């Protein structure tokens, strides 16, 4: 699982670049089986870290957070053409505010951002960071590293969260 410290130190961007490169390498016949095996090994430790969010789960998580922040999705670092925002909660929000990647917003505004993303057809995911649901993302399937893994046959995104937000 990825940690708050890996977000704060910006190591997360390196991981995302590696994923993007590996998915591209899957198109090369000579090495695709090796890449698939290595990628499968690395992704096993992230099983269950990414969950499709239901609107009621988003509301519960945001309303139960002590601090809420907004910033560009992590995938935006790779794909600058599709700016949409993620909501960060609690210690992840604090860490990303501290490094200038995110800014604090009200819970009400965070809920509006997520509802607007849903209206625009965004895939909304909850990411467990340091073992807690701390990132709510408005994914675009075209520019989402996790969705690209799914499309390549890796089951990295779990099913829907429960309506009680018991993640």
Locations of the language-model features?
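Compact structured core domains
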Residues: 94-129, 136-140
């Amino acid at each position: 699982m990825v940690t708050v410290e890996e977000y704060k130190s910006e190591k997360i961007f390196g991981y995302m670049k590696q994923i993007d490169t590996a998915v591209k390498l899957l198109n090369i016949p000579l090495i695709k089986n090796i890449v698939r095996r290595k990628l499968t090994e690395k992704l096993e430790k992230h099983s269950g870290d990414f969950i499709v969010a239901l609107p009621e789960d988003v509301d519960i998580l945001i309303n139960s957070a002590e601090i809420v922040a907004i910033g560009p999705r992590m995938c935006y670092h790779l794909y600058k053409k599709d700016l949409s925002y993620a909501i960060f909660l609690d210690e992840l929000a604090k860490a990303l505010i501290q490094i200038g990647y995110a800014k604090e917003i009200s819970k009400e505004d965070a809920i509006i951002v997520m509802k607007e993303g849903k209206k625009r057809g965004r895939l909304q995911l909850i990411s467990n960071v340091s073992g807690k649901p701390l990132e709510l993302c408005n994914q675009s399937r075209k520019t989402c590293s996790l969705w690209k893994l799914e499309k390549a046959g890796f089951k990295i995104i779990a099913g829907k969260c429960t309506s009680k937000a018991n993640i």
